[in-house]
């Protein structure tokens, strides 16, 4: 058996979008019911990919403004980011491009990002929207549009509560590291030049 490859995967996104629940749901198949804001936490999972073992180091971060100076310390050495927003929070969706992409580009340029829409189970929950009249759901099309805007190789919608697509999120993160998407090479100006003979 070959030595396992280590992948550092860091979750980022606004507070209360479900980053910790996503990690706990993935690593223990349980859904925590109490909300306790994260300062910093670490999880680990061994995953077999194409017959090889991958040790997936999962770093949980605090989305709250209070931790803006502390949070980037976890970015060093990251192989991939899971950038999460809530499918029932327009503010968290808007902060992907307003706050998180600038932060990641500044502290970890070139590291791939998997965009994740969380709380999928609540998007079609009529009772939730009756109880929260100001909430606006984010559509799959809006998520895809945001993925293209930020240049993320993957966009996945999931529910930590029902486990729907939870494994797919981390499979995508591993795949992005092990099989990076081919980037289109831009032609240099010399190649674009027209020659008149």
UniProtKB/Swiss-Prot annotation:
GTP binds at residues 13-20, 60-64, 118-121. One of its GO terms (biological process) is small GTPase-mediated signal transduction. GO terms for cellular component: cytoplasm; membrane. Transmembrane segments: none annotated. The modification Cysteine methyl ester is found at residue 194. Gene3D superfamilies: P-loop containing nucleotide triphosphate hydrolases. Residues 195-197 form a propeptide. It is a peripheral membrane protein. It is found in: Cytoplasm; Membrane. Its main location: cytoplasm. GO terms for molecular function: GTP binding; GTPase activity. Keywords: Cytoplasm, GTP-binding, Lipoprotein, Membrane, Methylation, Nucleotide-binding, Prenylation. A motif (Effector region) lies at residues 35-43. A lipid is attached at residue 194 (S-geranylgeranyl cysteine). Inactive GDP-bound Rho GTPases reside in the cytosol, are found in a complex with Rho GDP-dissociation inhibitors (Rho GDIs), and are released from the GDI protein in order to translocate to membranes upon activation. Belongs to the small GTPase superfamily. Rho family. This is Rac-like GTP-binding protein RHO1. It comes from Beta vulgaris (Sugar beet).
């Amino acid at each position: 058996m070959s030595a396992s490859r280590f992948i550092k995967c860091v979750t980022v996104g606004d507070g209360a979008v479900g980053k910790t629940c996503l990690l706990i749901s993935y690593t223990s198949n349980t859904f925590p019911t109490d909300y306790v804001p994260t300062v910093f936490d670490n999880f680990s999972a061994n995953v077999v990919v194409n017959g090889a073992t991958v040790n997936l180091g999962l770093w949980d971060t605090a989305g709250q403004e209070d931790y803006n100076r502390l949070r980037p310390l976890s970015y060093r050495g990251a192989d991939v980011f899971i950038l999460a927003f809530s499918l029932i929070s327009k503010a968290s969706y808007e902060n992907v491009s307003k706050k998180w992409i600038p932060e990641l580009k500044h502290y970890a340029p070139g590291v791939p990002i998997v965009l994740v829409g969380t709380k999928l189970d609540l998007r079609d929950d009529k009772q939730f929207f009756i109880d929260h009249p100001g909430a606006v759901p984010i559509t799959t099309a809006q998520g895809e549009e945001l993925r293209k805007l930020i240049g993320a190789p993957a966009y996945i919608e999931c529910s930590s509560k029902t486990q729907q697509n939870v494994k797919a999120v981390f499979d995508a993160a591993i795949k992005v590291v092990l099989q990076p998407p081919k980037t289109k090479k831009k032609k240099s100006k010399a190649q674009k030049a027209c020659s008149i003979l």
